[in-house]
Amino acid sequence: MSAASLKVTSTARPGSRLAVEVAIPAERSQASYEAAISQLSRSVNLPGFRKGKVPRSVLVQQLGGLRIRATALENLVDAIWRDTIKQETIEALGQPEVDGGYEALLESFEPGKPLSITFEADVAPTPTLKTTKGLKAEAESVSFDAAKVDEMLEQSRRQLATVVPVEGRKAAQGDIAVVGFKGTYSDDGSEIEGGSSESMDVDLEHGRMIPGFIEGVVGMTVGDSKTVACNFPEDYPKEDARGRKASFEIELKDLKTRELPDLDDDFAKQASEQETLAELRTDLEKRLKDDAERRTTSNRRDALLAALVEQLEVELPETLVQQEVRNLVEQTAAQFSQQGMDVKSLFTPDLVRNLMETSRPEAEERLRRSLALSALAEAESLKIEDPEIDAKVKEVTAQLSGERDIDPNRLRQAVIEDLLQEKLLGWLEENSTVTEKAPDKDKPSVTDA
């Protein structure tokens, strides 16, 4: 029976879902039943009969009519759905649900009689934009901060410093203290898990330890012991320690400091590929200016994309949302794995459920951005031509010449997506207005990185 003979009635449902009612003629339900008997006769083992040679009456008696009907219906449902989405050109996502449930459908299924099945499935969304031109947005402009050059030079000096022992003075800010310590909670006197050490190097810099610890060590002399009061911050990683007061018995066992190299041409050669300090400063300035420019562009485009999403009209299908949530969780797992963590033991079922729940808002936002750009490409007929794609694929392939297992089809698709996104964002900038807004004072400077 061809799919063209199916009578189909489709009704849109909320959440980018489609209800599809299919009228199945009697002859097709009978054909599925006959096919099920043939299928089971070839696979079932009955004493005294060869496979495929079991008489029909014996097969029905041994297996029971319910099993045969269930097999027939299962095959029928699968075949009808495949034929329906092909006939109606339905872009379905995932597997459909049978309205009323499979068990109820099985009860009403009689081979040789007409049958009506209502499927419900997520379908690809159809995003539209209320407008594409004249969008307005505000974005932070990132300025080059010359003071960051000196900060980066100081960081390099610290990395190249020589550690030497300290004699004849007390511990000071910036020193390296070798301490033994034991911590207990002030409220119940219990020992702090992980809060003790026989010997540990501690940089005496603000923020290295919980509040009160560094301040307590500063001013001590090698051989001194003292008890220091500390406070665990409210955002401390270990939940049971958050906000609690603690005391640490600290012994200063040794004291060291860093001798920084002179800020001169020799330092520049040691710290970089530059020959002089002046060249190193120029190189750092260029990097910071380029970084500020990239971040400014990124801020502008993020703001424009947010403005475009505000114009988006779409219903997100749950199938796509869950797929994007899984992608985010897998990315998190991959990041942990790259850091050397045991993902299998770390990612318990409870943690995965929590991650999936907390990742949902980001997943939905990512989908909206992607769909907004797709709608823009459709509305403005923006696309990438083959010569541009070929040139970029050639360039990327050359950069990945040492890599193995490169799928050329996936690489080409990734190149197309990147080029199209760049073109769409560029088009948005040309056809929208972005005004500068004051930086968020609570936000760390982007050039700190």
UniProtKB/Swiss-Prot annotation:
Pfam families: FKBP_C, Trigger_C, Trigger_N. GO terms for molecular function: peptidyl-prolyl cis-trans isomerase activity; protein folding chaperone; ribosome binding. Signal peptide: none annotated. It is found in: Cytoplasm. Gene3D superfamilies: 3.10.50.40, Trigger factor ribosome-binding domain, Trigger factor, C-terminal domain. Its EC number is 5.2.1.8. It catalyses: [protein]-peptidylproline (omega=180) = [protein]-peptidylproline (omega=0). The keyword ATP-binding does not apply. Keywords: Cell cycle, Cell division, Chaperone, Cytoplasm, Isomerase, Rotamase. It is an enzyme of class 5 (isomerase). GO terms for biological process: 'de novo' cotranslational protein folding; cell division; chaperone-mediated protein folding; protein transport; protein unfolding. It comes from the Bacteria. One of its GO terms (cellular component) is cytoplasm. Residues 430-449 are annotated as: Disordered. InterPro entries: PPIase_dom_sf, PPIase_FKBP_dom, Trig_fac, Trigger_fac_C, Trigger_fac_C_sf, Trigger_fac_ribosome-bd_bac, Trigger_fac_ribosome-bd_sf, Trigger_fact/SurA_dom_sf. Residues 174-261 form the PPIase FKBP-type domain. Belongs to the FKBP-type PPIase family. Tig subfamily. This is Trigger factor. It comes from Synechococcus sp. (strain CC9311). The gene is tig.
